[in-house]
Amino acid sequence: MNKNELVSAVAEKAGLTKADAASAVDAVFETVQSELKNGGDIRLAGFGSFSVSRREASKGRNPSTGAEVDIPARNVPKFSAGKGLKDAVNS
């Protein structure tokens, strides 16, 4: 499912126009990004948690030349599925 399909599904299930559903979906995505960028996390009971994890600097190799390269430290987003989502997927 891509973003347009998600917007259509939200519009249908919530009885919204596609424009209103698109605004709602965009608002959710922007809020998640903003909260994670500011170092926060988002916990949705029964669905899962979004958080940021720090990945330390490391050494890697260029696959075509074999030369060693430095990979800088960075923040990476993480999602951990909640019990409700896991149960729904496995039922």
Swiss-Prot record:
Q: Which domain of life is it from?
A: Bacteria
Q: Which CDD domains match?
A: HU (cd13831)
**By its UniProt entry, which Gene3D superfamilies does this protein fall under?**
IHF-like DNA-binding proteins (4.10.520.10)
The Swiss-Prot or TrEMBL record annotates one GO molecular function as: structural constituent of chromatin
Q: Which keywords accompany this UniProt record?
A: DNA condensation, DNA-binding
**Pfam family name, one:** Bac_DNA_binding
Q: Could you name the Gene Ontology cellular component terms for this entry?
A: cytosol
Q: Which PROSITE patterns match?
A: HISTONE_LIKE (PS00045)
Name the Gene Ontology biological process terms.
Answer: chromosome condensation
> What exactly does this protein do?
Histone-like DNA-binding protein which is capable of wrapping DNA to stabilize it, and thus to prevent its denaturation under extreme environmental conditions.
Q: Give the similarity note.
A: Belongs to the bacterial histone-like protein family.
Q: What is this protein called?
A: DNA-binding protein HRL18
Q: Taxonomic lineage per UniProt? A: Bacteria, Pseudomonadati, Pseudomonadota, Alphaproteobacteria, Hyphomicrobiales
